[in-house]
Amino acid sequence: MKLSMPRFDQAPVLVVGDVMLDRYWHGGTSRISPEAPVPVVKVDQIEDRPGGAANVALNIAALGAPASLVGVTGQDEAADSLANSLQAAGVRSIFQRIAHQPTIVKLRVMSRHQQLLRIDFEEPFATDPLSLGEEVEGLLEGVKVLVLSDYGKGALRNHQALIQAARQKQIPVLADPKGKDFSIYRGASLITPNLSEFEAIVGRCADEAELVAKGLKLLEELDLGALLVTRGEHGMTLLRVGHPALHLPARAREVFDVTGAGDTVISTLAAAIAAGEDLPHAVALANLAAGIVVGKLGTAAISAPELRRAIQREEGSERGVLSLEQLLLAIDDARAHNETIVFTNGCFDILHAGHVTYLEQARAQGDRLIVAINDDASVSRLKGPGRPINSVDRRMAVLAGLGAVDWVISFPEATPENLLRQVKPDVLVKGGDYGIDQVVGADIVKAYGGTVKVLGLVENSSTTAIVEKIRKH
């Protein structure tokens, strides 16, 4: 299944559900309390993040999709914090504020990236389902997907009215379910329970075959369009009537914190479907997104560049011949891992042993090596008629096959100065016997604090000499 980045900017999504504030107290621990055998945390940072349905909306907006949110809060500073954070993220939020009842707050005490304690401040909201439904119906115009983010806190009480209102407008409804009665989601386009939520409804599943059988039965009983069971380290399983089960393995490189992973799944699904992706592709994108977000601390969102880089890794474009856009994203990812970027350039018309040795030496100057080559017209201007011997596509393909080379890109000018201004490598490398100040682009790299190095060339290795020798014979 080939993946590509959807046009999220054309994918408006409406989220309705239980909003909450995830509050974090960060601090150091160096002693045990004399009052009880518990650690003493000296708080030095307080952080607020949107949680629940608000985190779903935040994730959708972070992908670049227009996001609207309807929910219930108290009339307090926690609601104000939520509203401010969502506004800053570009989410349009409409809160039904209830007097004399607090906004739901999940307070986590953190030390050294570990959660020591969670304290919940909440009372289920006894909202009037008609009032919330009226807010939603007025917002459905122009929306491409409706998400029901249900945490069982009271904001969603008339699920069927919302589902039917969306279906009448042919708007897909995605629901992240809670509780032991999934019949309230009857008629939804897709529900996304995790494995424990799913087994609470259908009973324990001994293997995948039983999971599929019970899932298909649930689909038919509830008239669901599809069922996606998220299974932690075992990945995800997508079930649809009339289609084979689709099992996707987990994509996480490192699991650091699973808080909010379900929110990331449904938000990526919603944005992708709203952008016109079919369901299997949307699920594959959601699986990639979940693999990224579990590597972050606490409730977190995945950004469009992060998802784009994950797609590139999935499609094998993490190395090799890249476009400028792909290269800049790959560089961002490498720098996020504190990797040093090395850049060299040339025509590389006929690759020989001298080139290979030089590129290995260049690669040793850092962690990632970019090789930029002159395109065919540029080589012809530099070397004269009859050059290049090999086309730019062939030259790039050969270079990309070398173990020392990470990324290959071409440029049309005589020199790579324009490319250097955009790439901004940490190290510019050139082969030859001239001074550093004579290296083309040295002034550009040195101006932003980069390093320029000149490496010696292997003797008796020259493309021009090889070409002349061939012509004489």
Curated annotation (Swiss-Prot):
Annotated region described as Cytidylyltransferase, given as residue ranges: 343-473
Catalysed reactions listed for this entry: D-glycero-beta-D-manno-heptose 7-phosphate + ATP = D-glycero-beta-D-manno-heptose 1,7-bisphosphate + ADP + H(+); D-glycero-beta-D-manno-heptose 1-phosphate + ATP + H(+) = ADP-D-glycero-beta-D-manno-heptose + diphosphate
One record GO biological process: ADP-L-glycero-beta-D-manno-heptose biosynthetic process
Record-annotated disulphide pairs: none
Metabolic or biological pathway: Nucleotide-sugar biosynthesis; ADP-L-glycero-beta-D-manno-heptose biosynthesis; ADP-L-glycero-beta-D-manno-heptose from D-glycero-beta-D-manno-heptose 7-phosphate: step 1/4; Nucleotide-sugar biosynthesis; ADP-L-glycero-beta-D-manno-heptose biosynthesis; ADP-L-glycero-beta-D-manno-heptose from D-glycero-beta-D-manno-heptose 7-phosphate: step 3/4
Subunit structure, interactors included: Homodimer.
Name by which UniProt lists this protein: Bifunctional protein HldE
Origin species: Pseudomonas entomophila (strain L48)
Lineage of origin: Bacteria, Pseudomonadati, Pseudomonadota, Gammaproteobacteria, Pseudomonadales
Gene name tied to this protein: hldE
